[in-house]
Structures are given as structure tokens and as C-alpha cells.
Curated annotation (Swiss-Prot):
Entry's Gene Ontology cellular component terms: mitochondrial inner membrane; respiratory chain complex III
Subunit (UniProt): The cytochrome bc1 complex contains 11 subunits: 3 respiratory subunits (MT-CYB, CYC1 and UQCRFS1), 2 core proteins (UQCRC1 and UQCRC2) and 6 low-molecular weight proteins (UQCRH/QCR6, UQCRB/QCR7, UQCRQ/QCR8, UQCR10/QCR9, UQCR11/QCR10 and a cleavage product of UQCRFS1). This cytochrome bc1 complex then forms a dimer.
Origin organism lineage: Eukaryota, Metazoa, Chordata, Craniata, Vertebrata
Record protein name field: Cytochrome b
Cofactor section: heme b
Amino acid sequence: MALNLRKNHPLLKIVNDSLIDLPTPSNISTWWNFGSLLGICLVTQIVTGLLLATHYTADTSLAFNSVAHMCRNVQFGWLIRNLHANGASFFFICIYLHIGRGLYYGSYLNKETWNVGVILLLTLMATAFVGYVLPWGQMSFWGATVITNLFSAIPYIGQTLVEWAWGGFSVDNPTLTRFFALHFLLPFVIAGLTLVHLTFLHETGSNNPLGIPSDCDKIPFHPYYTIKDILGFALMLTSLVALALFSPNLLGDPENFTPANPLATPPHIKPEWYFLFAYAILRSIPNKLGGVLALAASILVLFLMPLLHTSKQRSMTFRPLSQILFWVLVANLLVLTWIGSQPVEQPFIIIGQLASLSYFTIILVLFPIAGVLENKLLKL
């Protein structure tokens, strides 16, 4: 009998075991679609980014004009740029929903997969930050100045570190050049980490909405979940193209239509929408080092999730107290996102401080307490 090439060829075998014959729980919902959507986001960003890089010039005197030239004179350059800029927003929407799914259904108990995932989030945030600087508009320049300056809060080595990162005494040409190099490199680091993420995931298999082992009821990934994923791709890409064509600047900052000017500070310096929650936490502490530590903690706290799990059930499906806390946390993050976009004045300051405090309280204190309480109520 002839060998099945799909199952025996050294390379095709890897594809087969990951995308075709992969045993998958039969009951995973649409919340499990976001992993593959993130893969599509990454591919889209790398392709559009590569096309943009062929026309971009990483020099302070030319960067802004090279982006304008791209949008005016390059065939479909405007579309490629709009897809790339808005693709970043979709990337973050998908990753936040993906993390939310992981928190709700207890996926973080696959510790290796979860930890690599958090590292992926940090890498994505770094990539988006350095990418935002490249068009060299006002918000690009001042965003880079403000955020890189935060490292000067590190005791003793801070200022040296910042000047080393800048390549001078302010954000200037060397900074732009190295940020372009980093922005080109990091997506490939993300692609590599994604393979590690999947390798760890396929060691244990996917979790499912019930949070119970599903070994007794697995189905092949293809055709069941390939067709389900394709529906997700179609919906996401349609939304992305619609946004890029009809309202490409909806999520951007108008300040970035003005070329970078070190002598004029914009009235409100703020990052893109997907960083606003962390920016609000940073600003809620009236101390530079404290703010930086809170900013770091707001993301790094995800590493603690497996350690804070006190419930004897994996998923929140049958845990109403934890569910209430989860949705309060979601609402809290939306409040933080709104506060991050507002000026530093009352009542926004106090709202931001309360929202920041409740963010950490819910994750570090209330979730573990709710888990213990539910165990007692259910006599587990």
C-alpha cells in the first residue's frame, strides 16, 4: 500500500498534526477562534508592512514625506498603509479577546502556553509602540519621547539607559533608524514565539468551555474547525477592509497629520487606544517610578494567574461569583481606557485612581477569594 504523504513527509507531517488530524474538543465555541485570527493578523501585518518598508525612508527629514508619498503616488499605497495601521487595532482587539477567553475558561492552567502567550503580548506591544513612531508625526515624536523617558525612572542607570536607547540626548534620527530596525525584526520574533506557543498547546491539547478533560470526545480539526476558522477570517478581514476603506482615521490621532516638531508639544499626549488602559494606570500614581512599576505590573500580573487560581473547577462556566468579578474587570478596563484618553484633571484623576486600584484588587485579591468561597458553597 502506498504511504500517505501527508502523514509521512517530514514537513507535511508537522502541518498535518497541527492543522488537519489534530484531535480537538468537540465543544469549543467561537471564543476559540481568536488564536487563528491572530495568526491571520500577523500574516496581514507582515505582508502589508513589507510592502510599506519598500517605500519608507527611516530618516527624520524624509520619514513623514515618504509616508505621504506612499499614500499619494504609490499604486494602492493608501490602502496598504490604512490596512497596516488599522490591522494593528484588529490585532489588539483579537489578542485582548483571546486573553479574556483564557481568563474566563481557565486556559492559564496550561502554564507554559500561557507564559509564552504573555511574552507574545509584551512583544506585540513593543512592536506596536516602535511602529507608531515611524510616520514621524507630532504624536509619534512626543509619544516616543514620553514613553522612552519612563525608563529614566529606573534608579542609578535610568538616564544612561534612556540616552543609550535614544542614541543621543533626545529622540532624533538615530532613534528613528533603530526603531525602524526593531519594527522590522520583532514581527518575525512574534512568528517564532507563536510556533513555541502552539508547540506547548499541542502538548496538552485545547481547553474547552466546560473546563473538563475532553480526551473521550475529540474530533479532527479538519474539516470541522478549518471551516469554522475560515468564517472567522472572512468576518474579520471584511471588518478590517471596511474600516480601512470607509473610516481609516477613526482610531488614529489627528495630531499625527502634523510633522514632528520638537519645539511644539501637543495639548494632550496620548498613545493609541489599545494602550490607554495601561497609560491610565501609569498616570494614576503621582510618582514617576511608582507609575512605571504599576504600568509594568498591569501586564506582568498575567504571569501570576496560574498561581492565583484557588477554585477546584477550571472554568468560570459554573462559578457565578467569579463571572460577576470577571465582567466587572472588563467594565473596569473600559473605564481605564476612557480615562487614559482624558486630560489630567478632576474628576478624571480620581476615577483613574479608583479604577487602577480596583483592577489590581479584583485580580490579586477578589478572584482568589471568590474561588475559595465557591468551593465552600459547592462543598468541593
